[in-house]
Amino acid sequence: MQLLGSVASPFVRRLRLVLAGQPYQFVALNIFESEGRSVLVQHNPARKVPVLVDGEQVIFDSGVIYRYLASKLKFKPLSWDQENGLTTINACTDSLVELLLCKRSGFDVTEDKLFFNLQHERIQATLEALEQQIRAGHFGDWDYPGISLFTLIDWILFRDLVDLKPFPVLLQFRNAHLNRPMVAETDPRLS
C-alpha cells in the first residue's frame, strides 16, 4: 500500500497515524509544485490529498480511505456519534483550508464578505462543539475520530490559524496525545 499526500495536511496525517505499525509506504508530495501535482493528478481527478494506492485499487478522500482500511484491517465500526464528530472535525478543517488558500491567494479573509463570514462562523461553532464533546466524554480513545481531532488541533497551532486559548479543553486534548506512536514522526514542523 502507498499513501500519497503532503506532510502538512491534517487529512493525510490522520491516516499516517491510523496506519502506525502497518506495512505501507508514505509518498510525500508537494502538490503546489509541478512534479508533486503531476503525481497527484495521475491518481486523483479531484486533485486532493490523500490518495491510497493498494495494488490496482485507488481510493480518494480521507474518510473513504479510512472506511477502506477499516474493512481491510478489521477495525471496529464507527458509531453514529463518532461519525457526527468526524463531520464536525471535517467541517472545521475544510473551512480552515478554504481560508488558508484564500489568504495565500492574496485575499483579506477578515473582510466582511459572505464566504469569509460563513467560514469563520463555522470554525467558531465547530470548535465550541468539539470542546463540549470532549467535556462530555467523547474522543476518549486513540481511534480514527480521536486521531482526526488531534491532527486538526495540532494543524491549527502549526499554521497559527485560530487563537485556541479560549478552548483550553482542545489544547489539553492535544497535549495529552503528543507522545502517541508516530505523532512526533508525522509532525509537519519537522519537514
Over which residues does each language-model region extend?
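Long hydrophobic alpha-helical segments typical of transmembrane helices together
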Residues: 169-191
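Short, contiguous strand/loop micro-motifs
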Residues: 2-3, 161, 185
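GST-like domain detector, emphasizing the conserved glutathione-binding G-site
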Residues: 1-114
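GST-like fold's C-terminal all-alpha helical module
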Residues: 93-176
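Short, hydrophobic secondary-structure boundary micro-motifs
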Residues: 77-78, 108-109, 165, 184-189
